[in-house]
A protein has these predicted regions:
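Extracellular/periplasmic carbohydrate-active domains that bind, remodel
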Residues: 1-248
Length: 248
């Protein structure tokens, strides 16, 4: 899919399920005002590449998925080998992995993206019932409103998996995190630049996360720029904190 404009689908605009070798480039996706209006959603799909695209979405610009419990656990078809680069959010929720990730997600690489104008920046989210895993995610050379890797309590319906999800092995390098986000009414708010929150069970912490050459904008004070709970093996290397810009 090249050079196309997709607009105002009833829900997700591009949904690639059980697919392989899908490339999308130089497209514009618009769904501002559409509830659950995701842009580009690989779902139990492999070897999908997205680049040089512009997003104005009512929900996630990109949502990487692999099925929802219990069907996703039973089918057990992971999403892997996803590449996203040179993409820009004009409005929307940014890039997300989950929360429908019951079949597992692995080997995701994201670079040269601008998700400053977004609600969630770059978010990895899972509920306790989902099961599955997200692992081996690399992000570099991006500007993001903020970063979240966290357990969430909403959309926690359906028969639960035997064990909670595993969230592990993330690397963020040369990223700028603004510590502020824009909501659905186009109003800016401050927020932690980094939020890491695992599940409160042994072996289900968020683990093995490395930040290197990161710039944080200080909008909330030093004790609120980074929030961590139920985490294991988190490291920071060469982090620069600069004065933030208060939302107007």
């Amino acid at each position: 899919m090249e050079g196309l404009t997709f607009a105002n689908g009833a829900s997700w605009n591009l949904h690639m399920i059980y697919s392989d070798q899908i490339a999308t480039d130089h497209c514009t996706i618009r769904s501002d005002g559409v509830w659950n209006g995701d842009g580009w959603d690989p779902d139990s799909a492999t070897n999908c590449t997205l680049f040089a695209c512009e997003f104005f979405t009512g929900d996630d610009a990109v949502a990487i998925k692999s099925g929802k419990n219990p069907e996703g656990n039973l089918i057990n078809r992971p999403t892997k080998h996803i590449r996203v680069f040179d993409c820009h959010s004009g409005f929307g929720h940014g890039i997300c992995i989950g929360s429908e990730m019951s079949g597992g997600v692995e080997d995701v690489k994201i670079w040269d993206c601008d998700m400053a104008m977004s609600t969630s920046g770059l978010e990895v989210k899972a509920t306790k019932k989902r099961g599955g895993y997200v692992r081996n995610v690399e992000v570099r050379d991006c500007t993001l409103s903020h970063v979240m890797v966290h357990a969430v309590g909403y959309n926690d319906d359906g028969i639960g998996a035997p064990v909670p999800p595993v969230l592990e092995d993330f690397r963020y390098e040369r990223v700028t995190l603004l510590g502020r986000y824009i909501d659905h009414d186009h109003v800016w708010h401050t927020c932690p630049a980094i939020e890491l929150k695992g599940f409160d069970l042994p072996s289900h912490e968020v683990r093995n996360i490395h930040f290197k050459d990161v710039v944080l904008e200080d909008n909330r004070g030093p004790e609120q720029n980074i929030l961590m709970q139920d985490c294991l093996n988190v490291s920071f290397e060469n982090v620069t904190v600069r004065p933030g810009v208060q939302p107007g």
